[in-house]
């Protein structure tokens, strides 16, 4: 009998904070399963989920407004620990008899809170001490409103000069509220506070580990599909690759992977995918060379969004044709991950944040009577990578920089032509190779090359040439929502430029993109 890794679970109610997914990831890092739901859930839904504890997230609304979101009353009647973060603390305080007021000044950034009373939430946790020996905690604040009176059965655990109730607690009911964000790295002891809540107060065991997740996923796949055949669109990206490895472990040769080579991949990527999954791991793969079909469909198209739609449409057409050629396939597998499915649980009020979906196969074709297998749908990206390592996939593949779903189709500006893709592939390979050689690849978050459809005069030997321009792009970011351009060394950039111009016949000029996000986006299209 496989161990139930969902036995202990935390429910996170989302009030719209940009950090809510980070809260969930932190809980998972502690080895505990959690789910992220919109704030307006019903009592019946909470009862059915049967959480060991509940976390109320932050959010952009003001509890002083009449129609601002509130936690369901049952949250405070369920008999489980509750942890309110920022807005979550404010709505907890207000709903349980305290008072919240709009502050004249928004408090955003680093702060030190002074501990007044001991609490199970911060037992043994401190960053420094005051002159008279009281513990201090370095935290990250981000709030406008503040609690001005706590409920009568709560105590003040910690405060700052401007925030009289930075931490409040009702130890008997195991209700806790903090006016800062323990999930962000700027709150130095935040992870330990979350650990106190999840592991000590909620008494959750660390059952959510890569090895146990794999065992659970394999068993669930076998229960779902039995001896049936399954088809998967394998792109060579992280999600589809880990999905393929899980399915292969679960059902072996009953899995058929379809690899569509659209001509928009990185240098030698098609060969690498076939070698790794076909020859090395022994998966059953159908290789579909479709470069000409994609490039024909893209001919004459300059609009980025139109190019994305064309690439997506042609991929589905090619994949469907291959699927129909296979006999007795009853299941379609997809590399859907947890952020992809959060949107479906978003509140109809629009208060909960919406997560952009990833590029998957695009849904089941109407003619195909197949069931859907999604073994990664409970996992965040970092968890997918960890189980990929456990399954034997190479680190360099799992942790390489993001590559857009449409591939080079959106890194060749304007019309996509084979000539442009071939030049871009070679230039980009040189850039990435040099980043690795200089030990810079893992010091930037994403790096790539863009093909610009403009010609520039160059000099080679005694002659002049009139060839194409490429731009190098490298950024540093934590969440890809904002990004700084990477300050790569001048001698490094010079070396990359010289290699590209000398080794890639057809490129005469290399430029470096120094735009941040915002105002620019990371990708050019």
Swiss-Prot record:
Keyword Aminoacyl-tRNA synthetase (UniProt): no
Keyword Calcium: no
Residues reported in the UniProt entry to bind ATP: 235-241
Annotated catalysed reactions: XMP + L-glutamine + ATP + H2O = GMP + L-glutamate + AMP + diphosphate + 2 H(+)
Gene3D superfamilies associated with the record: 3.30.300.10, 3.40.50.880, HUPs
Keyword list, A-Z: ATP-binding, Glutamine amidotransferase, GMP biosynthesis, Ligase, Nucleotide-binding, Purine biosynthesis
Domain Glutamine amidotransferase type-1: 9-207
The name this protein goes by in its record: GMP synthase [glutamine-hydrolyzing]
Source organism (scientific name): Citrobacter koseri (strain ATCC BAA-895 / CDC 4225-83 / SGSC4696)
